[in-house]
Swiss-Prot record:
Protein family per UniProt: Belongs to the immunoglobulin superfamily. CEA family.
Organism the protein comes from: Mus musculus
Keywords recorded for this protein, A-Z: Cell membrane, Disulfide bond, Glycoprotein, Host-virus interaction, Immunoglobulin domain, Membrane, Phosphoprotein, Receptor, Repeat, Signal, Transmembrane, Transmembrane helix
Full protein name: Cell adhesion molecule CEACAM2
Listed Polar residues bias regions: 466-480, 490-513
InterPro entries in the cross-refs: CEA_cell_adhesion, Ig-like_dom, Ig-like_dom_sf, Ig-like_fold, Ig_sub, Ig_sub2, Ig_V-set, Immunoglobulin_dom
Amino acid sequence: MELASAHLHKGQVPWFGLLLTASLLASWSPPTTAQVTVMAFPLHAAEGNNVILVVYNMMKGVSAFSWHKGSTTSTNAEIVRFVTGTNKTIKGPVHSGRETLYSNGSLLIQRVTMKDTGVYTIEMTDQNYRRRVLTGQFHVHTLLLKSNITSNNSNPVEGDDSVSLTCDSYTDPDNITYLWSRNGESLSEGDRLKLSEGNRTLTLLNVTRNDTGPYVCETRNPVSVNRSDPFSLNIIYGPDTPIISPSDIYLHPGSNLNLSCHAASNPPAQYFWLINEKPHASSQELFIPNITTNNSGTYTCFVNNSVTGLSRTTVKNITVLEPVTQPSLQVTNTTVKELDSVTLTCLSKDRQAHIHWIFNNDTLLITEKMTTSQAGLILKIDPIKREDAGEYQCEISNPVSVKRSNSIKLEVIFDSTYDISDVPIAVIITGAVAGVILIAGLAYRLCSRKSRWGSDQRDLTEHKPSASNHNLAPSDNSPNKVDDVAYTVLNFNSQQPNRPTSAPSSPRATETVYSEVKKK
C-alpha cells in the first residue's frame, strides 16, 4: 500500500471524503510555534461523518511513523504504519478499511461510528532512532431522532389531577439536553411546574384548562438538535355558568324569540331549556316564532357535564310588551300672565310607561319651580316666567316603543306693573343706601335750624326795651317824617308739648315782639 498524498489523489477515498478532507485541511491553520501537535477536526463528529487527525510541524528526518487506537503504541493497537526507507504503508491489526494515511502524517477516518470515539496516538522515529509520541482525540455522537412526548394521564380533571410529561428521544441519553416549551414559550420550574433531573420529565400540578398546550420537547447534543411533534393535553373541565344571548329581555308581540345558551366545558356540555320551570327543549338554541304576551316569563338554561358530573343554570326573564299609544297633551291656558301658574297634563292609557317632558324639541330641565305628579303625567310651573314660553310635548315610552304627544305652544304675557323682583339687587341696595344718607342729611339740617331758632329767641329776650323807656314818637329831626305811627304788641306764648303728669311743670315763656307800622 502506497502512502496517500496530502493533495488527496483521486480514487483513494470517496469523492465526498475528499471534499471534506480538503476543507478541513484548508480551514486549520498550524500553531504559531514549531512544536509538533495533533488536532482532530471536528472534535465532535456526528455518526457517519468523517474525522481527520491533523499533524502540525512533523519532525524532520522521520524514518517511520505509525497511528494507534488508544493511549498506547502497542503493535496490537496499531492502525497503520509508514516506513520512509521502503516508502511503504503497512496496515495494523485494528485497521478497519476506513482509515487513510497522508504523507504529512495526518490520518483520515471515514464514516465514523460510536466505537471510534476516543484517543489516537502517533509514534514518530527519526533516523537516529529517537521517538516522539503525540495523542489526539475526538467524540462521535449519534444524530438525534425526533423525540416523542408521553403522558401518564390522558384525561386529567381541572383542579384535581396532576400530569407528568416525558420526552423520549430514542437515542443514547448521554450528552442530551432537554428543553420544554408551551405555546412557543420556554418553560421553567415554578409554583405548579416541576422538572426532573436532566429535565426529561415535566410535571404539572393541579392542572387547569390553560395547561392544555401544545407542548414541545427539544433535544440537543453537540452535533444535532431535534424537536418533538406538538403534544396537547385533553383537560376535563366545566361547565362554567352558562350565558344566554342576546341580552334583550323585552320584546313586542309578533316578534320571534331566539335565545342561545353557551357554557365553557370539556367535553361539551348537554343543554336543556325550561320555560317557567317546565322542561321545554334539549338543545343549545331556543326559537319561538310570533310570540304574544303569554310568552312572558322565566327562561332557564340548564347545562351538564357528564364526565365531571357538574351542572350549572342561568335564568333570564323575558317580558312581552304591547307598544305604547300616542299620548295627548292638555293645558289649563295657553296664554298665561307672568308670575301666574300653569298646569300641563299628559293623557295616556299606558300607566306603566316612562314619562318624558319635551320643551322646544329638547329635554325639559325640571327646576325648583316645576313639580310633577301622578307618575309624571302632570307638570305644574309656578311661577311662570317669560323664558318658559315655548312649545311643550310629553313623550311616552316603554322598552319596545316610544310615542310623542301633540305640541302645545305656551305664551307668557308681560305684566306692566313694576315687579320689584325684576329689579337687580345691586340697584335696590344702592337706593337703600342713598335713602339712608338723605334722611340723615335732613335730620341734621332740622337739628341745626332748631338750634339757631333757640338762640334768636334768647337774644330778643335779653335786648328788648321796656315799655316805659321806649320812645314811641319819632324824632323831630328825622329825615323821613311820617304822619302817624301805630304800634302793636304781640304776645307769643311758647307752648310746651304735653308731658306726663308725673313730670314737673315748667313755666311758660312769654315773649313780646314789637312791630312798627308806618303810614305814608
